[in-house]
C-alpha cells in the first residue's frame, strides 16, 4: 500500500479531491480456490483419585479430518489431508497442601495447515506485499507435550505457578524464504 493513495497525494493519483484509502483488486481468477474441511471428533475422560492426595486424569480425543483445497487453475496439484488421529492426555496431580499442588501432564495435540498454506498458488500479503506460495503436499503437525508445574493457590481466583515444558513437533509447518 503506497503513501500515494492516502492523504493529500490521493487527489493527484486518483483524480479526486477526497481523502481516503484506495484499494485495487489485482487478484487473478486462476488464484481462486475451493476448500472444504470436515472434522468429526469424540472425547472421553476419566478423573479418579488414586490416593488421598493423588489424582489421575486421563482422556483421549479422536478426530477424523478431511481437508480439501482445489485451485481454479487447472493443472495445479490438489491439496488434500485425510487423517484419523488419537490425541491422548494424561495428568497426575499431587496435593502438597490444600493450597499447593505438583502437576505433571503428557498430551498430544496437532496443527493443521490453513487453506492458504495448502492452496497451490501464490498470494500477495495485502499489508506487506510479500508473496507466499501454498504447498499442497503439507501434512498436519503432531505435537507431543510434557509439562511439569508447581501451583500455589493464594486465594480464590489467584494462582502463582512455576512451569517447565517440553514439546516435540513432527512435520512442523514452516515458512520457507525462497527469494526470486
Predicted stretch roles:
Residues 82-103, 107, 150-154:
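Transmembrane beta-barrel strand/turn architecture of Gram-negative outer membrane proteins
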Residues 3, 42, 58-64, 104-108, ...:
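Transmembrane beta-barrel strands of outer-membrane/channel proteins
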Residues 53-56, 99-102, 157-160:
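Repeated loop/turn-to-beta-strand initiation elements of outer-membrane beta-barrel proteins
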Residues 23-30, 71-76, 85, 127-134, ...:
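Extracytoplasmic loops and strand-loop junctions of Gram-negative outer membrane beta-barrel proteins
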Residues 27, 31-38, 110-169:
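Outer-membrane beta-barrel signature, preferentially recognizing the C-terminal barrel domain
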Residues 39-95:
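Surface-exposed extracellular loop regions of Gram-negative outer-membrane beta-barrel proteins
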Residues 1-32, 180:
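Flexible glycine-rich, low-complexity coil/linker segments exposed to the extracellular/periplasmic environment
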Residues 68-75, 115-121, 128-130, 173-179:
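Outer-membrane beta-barrel translocator domains and adjoining extracellular loop/strand segments
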